[in-house]
């Protein structure tokens, strides 16, 4: 049954959904990597598609920018459409000098300055972590492709334009691999509603050096990340 934000029916979505932030990136992923694709959502332009990858039914849908937006879509996919696993595939900014542009980062955990997980966890700190099996499958898929990945903590920021740039020094000290805006929220939603989640990011810009990819590159050139996500789903089926 359709929700206020997703005009689909039960069965339209696969049990696994890849979620980029940009709905146009969702369209690109569906058209480039999936077969027998059909559109299953277009409310507010947040495009969603279902198709098959090597015969396996998989969906892909955008989630927008920030924890509030991605949390709405993740929650509805899980509770209203039977989704069991969500893989966020997005971009992040690097703060460490040893993390380079276009590196692939797997978010084993996600720190945040958002208070959403404290709200759901009775004002206590909640350790927002990815599902272990999904993480291991992504690492194994990357190894099989010969892609070096970094595994560790992300930082999910509420503000894109931070008023406190000194916080980047703290992140670097604590070994944060990338800064993005959604992982901690998606991990919290998955935990609350009994699903599993993982975030895989490609470094789109470097906060220290000023290096960055273009919007067009972010939409079309992060193929390694997408292939790792898709292959990890197949590994999960065979486990």
From Swiss-Prot:
Identification of the protein by name: Purine nucleoside phosphorylase DeoD-type
Catalytic activity of the protein: a purine D-ribonucleoside + phosphate = a purine nucleobase + alpha-D-ribose 1-phosphate; a purine 2'-deoxy-D-ribonucleoside + phosphate = a purine nucleobase + 2-deoxy-alpha-D-ribose 1-phosphate
Gene that this sequence comes from: deoD
Species: Yersinia pseudotuberculosis serotype O:3 (strain YPIII)
Residues where phosphate binds: 21, 25, 44, 88-91
Lineage, top ranks: Bacteria, Pseudomonadati, Pseudomonadota, Gammaproteobacteria, Enterobacterales
Keywords: Glycosyltransferase, Transferase
InterPro entries assigned: DeoD-type (IPR004402), Nucleoside_phosphorylase_CS (IPR018016), Nucleoside_phosphorylase_d (IPR000845), Nucleoside_phosphorylase_sf (IPR035994)
Listed EC numbers: 2.4.2.1
HAMAP family assigned to the protein according to its UniProt record, in alphabetical order: Pur_nucleosid_phosp (MF_01627)
Molecular function GO labels: purine-nucleoside phosphorylase activity
């Amino acid at each position: 049954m359709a929700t206020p934000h997703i005009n689909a029916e039960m069965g339209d979505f696969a049990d696994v959904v890849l979620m980029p932030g940009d709905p146009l990136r969702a369209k690109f992923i569906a058209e480039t990597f999936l077969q027998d694709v059909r559109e299953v959502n277009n409310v507010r332009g947040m495009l969603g598609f279902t198709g098959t990858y090597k015969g396996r039914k998989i969906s892909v849908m955008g989630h927008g920018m920030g924890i509030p937006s991605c949390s709405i879509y993740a929650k509805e996919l899980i509770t209203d459409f039977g989704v069991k696993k969500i893989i966020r595939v997005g971009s992040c900014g690097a703060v460490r000098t040893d993390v380079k542009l276009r590196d692939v980062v797997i978010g084993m955990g996600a720190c945040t300055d958002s208070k959403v997980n404290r709200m759901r966890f009775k004002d206590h700190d909640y350790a927002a972590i990815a599902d272990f099996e999904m993480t291991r499958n992504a690492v194994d898929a990357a190894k099989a492709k010969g892609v070096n990945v970094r595994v560790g903590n992300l930082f999910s920021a509420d503000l894109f334009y931070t008023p406190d740039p000194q916080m980047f020094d703290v992140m670097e000290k604590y070994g944060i691999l990338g800064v993005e805006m959604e992982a901690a929220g998606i991990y919290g939603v998955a935990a609350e509603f009994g699903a599993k989640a993982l975030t895989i990011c490609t470094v789109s810009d470097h906060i220290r050096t000023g290096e960055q990819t273009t919007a067009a590159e972010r939409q079309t050139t992060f193929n390694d990340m997408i292939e790792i996500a898709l292959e990890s789903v197949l590994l999960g089926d065979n486990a």
